Each structure stands twice: as structure tokens, then as C-alpha cells.
Amino acid sequence: MNLQQKLAQFPRLDLVGSATPLEKLSRLSDYLGREIYIKRDDVTPMAMGGNKLRKLEFLAADALRQGADTLVTAGAIQSNHVRQTAAVAAKLGLHCVALLENPIDTQEENYLTNGNRLLLGLFNAQVEMCEALHDPQQQLADLATRLEAQGFRPYVVPVGGSNALGALGYVQCALEIAEQSQRSNVAFSSVVVASGSAGTHAGLAVGLQQLLPETELVGVTVSRKVIDQLPKVEQIQKALANSLAIDELAPITLWDDYFAPQYGMPNEEGLAAIQLLAQQEGVLLDPVYSGKAMAGLIDGVAQQRFRDDGPILFIHTGGAPALFAYHPQV
């Protein structure tokens, strides 16, 4: 059974539609002196796009299979994942309850009310604030218990949609990359992705190891040092591989030099990457995920950190709505 057939065994909603574009960034390539391509998961078709929709194809299908009437999830006030979960709930006629934290402890009006937070209101999500997501798995379980007592049938979507089931979405993305690579006759030496809640990274690690085993996958951390992030990626990678009856696991590569000072707080390199991509390519990155990941790619080229000097593929996970929340910093 090939990878596509294994994937087809899992219930899945068709939310993404056709494969997202894979394009060469010609002006950025000239600027960096290296062939750079981009996988446009920022233009998935719902709620201003983003990578979480791939995970929600599997997670929401599971919720419907279980007879849920409510999607429950958690994240930062400016969470792209929560925004996309709320949109999917609206599309499916489900209630959405979101547990939110303010990880950067700001009182900036745009952060508190604009960007992704504004969109949650449009999708009619029920928002509950908490002081901190110190144990999100337990906090979501407690919230689900309360909702059950009120007569709801909740389905807990993990933070970032990141578990073995959600990560199947990025095995599907790996299938698209392999097909598009073959069709365009480009052999990627490296793939770069933001590594946060770890499901996207783990899904690509499993998928690319099966399909493009010679391609290096680099996860640029957005919230943790390698010592803390590595077990998260490996845990999902292992569970995902088990669910697909895959024995061989690729080693995980992480770069943690680009997320300081902390998750959700912009830095100079990330903001410079946002400006560069906007001005060179008309592509919008964000200050939390893709801007910092692109800063890693740019510095990785400059410092010759990649395994070899072939074409690099950047996975654009989305997040542009957060630009409005971080004004005037951006």
C-alpha cells in the first residue's frame, strides 16, 4: 500500500480543494543568490488562508464522525489556528468555543481586538480568556467537561491542530510537494518550515522521508529552544508513523536562533524578512511564524547552514491577518 492509499483510509473533509501553488521566488532568488521556491499554504481557501486547514480536514471529519456539535480549542489571542477552527465550525454548522491567552501580556488595542481576534467575532466563536495556557490539554479537557454539563457535545481540537490525526494534513502536503517537484523538474535540496505546535513539522518529516528522502527538512522554532521542541516534534512524528504503519523515522533538524525574545513577540530579523518578501515578491509573511522562519532561511543561506547548495522550498504557513494586530510594530 502506498502513502496515498494509507492516507485515504482516514476520514477527511475536502476543505483545501486542489493543491496549493508551488512557485519560484525569482527576485528573492536573485537577491540571495540561491534558488528559492515557496509552497503557498497561505492561500488555502478559507478565512484568509493558512496551514491549519489541512489539519482540520482530518480533525473536523473525526468530530463529525463522533457526533460532535461543538469544536473546542485554544491558543493565543492572535492564533491563526483558532481563527481557522472557528471558520470551519461556521462552515459545518458547529458551535466553536475558544480558550485564549495573552502570551505577550500586552494592552495594545490592535493586538486585543484586530487581526485574528476580529475574525473570531465574525465567525461567532465563543471566547473565554484565561491567564495562561499552562497545561492546555488539561484546560481543554476541563472546558469540554463544562460544555458537556451544559448539554453540548464537544470535540477537543488540540492547540495548533497538532496531534497524529491532524498531522496527516502535512503528509498530504508532502504528497503535493513531491508531485509538483517532479512536474516542474526541480529537486529540492532543503525544505524550511516554522516549527511551533509541531504537527506541520512532524507531518512533513514523515511524508518527505517517504517521498523525497534525500531532501533536508529544517524546522525553524518559533517558541522554544531545541531541547524543548525536539520531543514535541518526535512524539507526533512517532505516533503519526505508527498510524501509517511506517517503521523508519527521519532525524529531526531544528534551528532555534530566530524566535527570541519569545513566542508572539516580533524581532528585528523577522520584521526585516516580512519587509523583504513584501517588497521583492508581493508576498505577506507574519511576525509570529512565517517571518521568523524566513529569517532563518535567509540567515541559513548567508551562513551556509544548509546541507548543500541546491534549491530551497519555503513552506508558507500563512498568518497575514496578524499583521494588522501587530501594527504599528510592523
From Swiss-Prot:
Keywords in alphabetical order: Lyase, Pyridoxal phosphate
E.C. designation(s): 4.4.1.15
GO biological process, one term: D-amino acid metabolic process
Main enzyme class: lyase
Reported cofactor(s): pyridoxal 5'-phosphate
Matching Pfam families: PALP (PF00291)
Gene Ontology MF annotations: D-cysteine desulfhydrase activity
Residues recorded with modification N6-(pyridoxal phosphate)lysine: 52
Lyase found in the keyword field: yes
Catalytic activity: D-cysteine + H2O = hydrogen sulfide + pyruvate + NH4(+) + H(+)
InterPro entries found in the cross-reference section: ACCD_DCysDesulf, D-Cys_desShydrase, D_Cys_desulphydr_bac, TrpB-like_PALP, TrpB-like_PALP_sf
PANTHER family the record matches: 1-AMINOCYCLOPROPANE-1-CARBOXYLATE DEAMINASE-RELATED
Family per similarity comment: Belongs to the ACC deaminase/D-cysteine desulfhydrase family.
Subunit and interaction comment: Homodimer.
Protein task: Catalyzes the alpha,beta-elimination reaction of D-cysteine and of several D-cysteine derivatives. It could be a defense mechanism against D-cysteine.
Name of the protein described by the UniProt record: D-cysteine desulfhydrase
Species name: Serratia proteamaculans (strain 568)
